[in-house]
A protein has these predicted regions:
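Domain-level signal for soluble alpha/beta catalytic cores
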Residues: 1-305
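Single conserved hydrophobic/aromatic residue that forms the stacking wall/gate
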Residues: 304-312
Length: 312
């Protein structure tokens, strides 16, 4: 089934965290995640196999910052194509090994470059679009089913990434931003503003990930639901982080996380997963609770204006 059609069939379950689980497995904070995963493939494949077993319908490729700007910080910009091929291949290998009796969709993960756009920074908008186009082309070449543009702090950067997808291919795209405690992005954008802009640009699903736990996302999802003609996405952290014996932990176990996700379903979220601190157990508990819920019906989007006519 085409992913756009699948999106409107009911709940879609995403995977959970990658980075926090790999840190538990030995990845250091200063490592290039893409290179570390390429050098430790079995750790990553095992994690994604466990997400499939837990009930995830969509796996994110470990290409979060596999763009030429971020890779250049590690002296790896020349290896972007090689790394992309390897990393998408690991997700496909996890699907193959799982022998799942359902289709598992591969999401090409795209995120921030770390560069500031003009006029705050020095990067022209058109150059950022070009950076994302390069990453999008490489992911599309490897056969991803959709793009996950995620953990974005700037609506302008979201626009650049989504434009890159739209001008390169006809592959679906989910877009999620992070919001602060005041309910706005770092640059002051409200959830409903982001929804309206990205929806008008053709994003296939829009929402929130990272930054907070599920209990802090309800108001934002409720605000977006008033204007949404696309599915709404939530991928929260497992609550708040804290240090224990020098290790970052999160305060929501699988049971409390899945319980806190249900109010998000009640206000309209239908595409659900986990971000920092979540594990396959968190996803498994979420899937169990979703069996008791009915997904919000997605309103039909009107692409033209129809005016009443009066006979003369």
């Amino acid at each position: 089934m085409d992913f756009r059609e699948f999106l409107r069939q009911g709940f879609v379950v995403l995977d959970g965290a990658t980075g926090s689980n790999l840190q538990q497995a030995g990845m250091e904070s200063g490592d290039c995640p893409e290179q570390w995963i390429a050098e430790h493939p079995e750790v990553f494949i095992d994690l994604q196999c466990r997400y499939i077993e837990a009930g995830s319908d969509v796996l994110y490729t470990p290409t979060f910052t596999c763009n030429r700007i971020k890779l250049d910080e590690y002296g790896l910009a020349s290896k972007q194509e090689e790394l992309t091929k390897t990393l998408v291949g690991l997700t496909k290998e996890a699907i193959r090994r799982s022998k799942a009796d359902r289709k598992i969709y591969v999401a090409g993960d795209v995120s921030m470059t770390g560069q500031q756009l003009e006029p705050i920074g020095s990067m022209p908008f058109e150059e950022l679009v070009d950076v994302y186009k390069q990453q999008v082309r490489l992911l599309a070449k490897e056969g991803v089913d959709l793009f996950a543009i995620e953990t974005m702090m700037s609506l302008q950067e979201c626009r650049a990434a989504l434009l890159a997808v739209k001008e390169t291919c006809d592959i679906p795209a989910l877009v999620t931003l992070t919001y602060q405690e005041d309910g706005r992005t770092l640059y002051g954008t409200s959830p409903e503003t982001a929804l309206v802009v990205l929806q008008s640009m053709g994003a296939d699903a829009i929402g929130i990930n990272c930054s907070t736990g599920p209990d802090k996302m309800v108001d934002a999802v409720k605000a977006m639901a008033k204007y949404a003609c696309v599915p709404l996405v939530v991928k929260p952290n497992a609550g708040l982080p804290f240090l224990q014996d020098g290790v970052t932990c999160y305060d929501m176990d699988a049971e409390s996380f899945s319980e806190a996700m249900m109010p998000l379903v009640d206000v309209g979220a239908t595409v659900l997963g986990g971000c920092c601190g979540t594990t396959p157990e968190h996803i498994q508990k979420l899937v169990s609770r979703l069996k008791e819920k009915k997904a919000r019906e997605i309103p039909v989007s009107y692409t033209h204006l129809t005016l009443p006519t009066t006979p003369y």
